[in-house]
Structure formats: C-alpha cells, structure tokens
Amino acid sequence: MSEHERPVEIRALGMDDLEQALQFVWEVYARTEAHARDDEAVQDFLSKIDFEYCAVRVGDGQLRLWGAFSEEKLIGVCAFLGLNRVYLLYVDPRAQGQGVATRLLKRAVFDSKRHDDTLPRLIVEAPDTAVGFFGKQGFVPVGEPTEDCGVWYTVMELTPEP
C-alpha cells in the first residue's frame, strides 16, 4: 500500500498530546520553512509553539488541536485559537498533496461549528507559503500583505457553509 492509499484518521488532541504535536510542528517548520527565514522569524515561530505558552491556552480552552494519523504516526497538526482563528496547520512533507491539511481544516471547522452553529467566519494570518492553499479552501484576502520578522502574512477570511 502506498503512502497515498493509507487511511488517515483525524482526531482531537489534548494536553497529553501537546508536546508531541508541538515537536512535530517544529520538525516540519525546520525542514520546510526555517531555511528561508531570518533568525528573528525563527525565534518568533518558536515562541508561538512554546510548550508553556500553548499548555496554558489548551488548559483554558483557548487553543484546540487536531492531529492527522496514518498507521498511528502523526502526519499533520491543525490548531485553532478560539473557535475561528487558524493558529497552526502543518503536514509532513511526505504527506502533502494528499488532502491531509484540507481534512484537518474541515474537522476543525466542524468541531468549531458544534460549539457555535452561528460561526460567522474563520480567520487566518497566512504566511506567504500558505496563501495559495488557503485560497483553494475558499479563504479570501481581507487586506494587503504585511511583513513581520521578515515574513509576509495575508489576513484571509472564510465564511463557513451553514
């Protein structure tokens, strides 16, 4: 069975999964993006995935995470701040292009709508490397790109289907 044919399970992650999820996100970032970023941008990213910072937010329900697993191996992570802000979305490069990120995002939206069925919109500050992906998911830019720590971000929104 090829990597593409393996079944992928999407499930909510909790505090017990946080360290593994953040380590996974760092490993993907380090392999795919860090080389193109300056030291300030890498440090900024590391602060975003700091265990203590994230643990507090998971503990109080502000940060929610989902994982994609293939044969019990973590191959993708999605995190939302609150119900509608995409915080992280990272997929193992070997599993990219197989719909894993799309499935993670859809599950996160589904779970968010279970908490608030009137969810008005989703927001993402998409880095330059992810604008195309989010555009394909129906997100539209709501402003001009802005630069922070050498990385260009575009705020994008999506109005979920009822």
Language-model segments: residues:
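Conserved beta-hairpin
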Residues: 62-76, 81
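Conserved GNAT acetyl-CoA-binding A-motif
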Residues: 112-127
